[in-house]
Amino acid sequence: MPDTQLIPESPVAVEPAPAPAARKRPKPGERRVQILHTLAEMLQQPGAERITTAALAARLEVSEAALYRHFASKAQMFEGLIEFIEQSVFTLVNQIGEREPAGTGQAAKIVAMLLHFAEKNPGMTRVMVGDALVFENERLQQRMNQFFDKIESTLKQSLRGALDGAGSATPGLDAQVRASMLTAFAVGRLQRFARSGFKRPPSEHLEASLARML
């Protein structure tokens, strides 16, 4: 789980007292973040089975009803994780676009960023490749499909300018083929990472792999 947004509430030290102090109740926004953080932590356990709201509530030491005060359904919880993935990744994509000129170098940095993001967030990786969504609402998988479609489109746009300058007779087609190949490579690396129990890092031999493709 990343340490940028989904950070659990820090415990507050209290002085010993004759009577036990009441547990501090998190604010609504803090509780939502705590729920998502815990869900992502549970997803990153190798071999984790389908996560139920009962198991999530037990981990948080709250009732299932308490979860539903913050999310209408478990699908909405997964949507919260997907939103975090989308916002994090495409914010970084935009930063790369501002720093790097369009071309193969920019495309390589986008792919590397995506794989490093997944490597640092194993629980999110299971959402990205769909393993965690198998038994959930179909729209969640559709949304992740759209995420990778957008990644592919971004890579195509990045590569198109370089191919135009290189004198390609079919720059649009060539850019599409390369973008599709890079996206398939990235998805394959994420799937291997998840299905190896997070033992095979997606960034393994990354520079050499990208050099062969670009």
For the regions a language model picked out, list residue spans one by one.
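N-terminal intrinsically disordered/low-complexity leader segments
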Residues: 1-30, 163-167
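Hydrophobic/aromatic-rich alpha-helical bundle segments in the mid-to-C-terminal region
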Residues: 3, 125-130, 141, 145, ...
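Alpha-helical structural segments
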Residues: 30-41, 45, 59, 76-99, ...
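Ser/Thr-centered, proline-biased regulatory motifs
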Residues: 49-55
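Helix-turn-helix DNA-binding module
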Residues: 57-58, 138
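Short hydrophobic/aromatic patch on the recognition helix
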Residues: 61-71
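Short helix-capping/turn signature of helix-turn-helix
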Residues: 71, 130-136
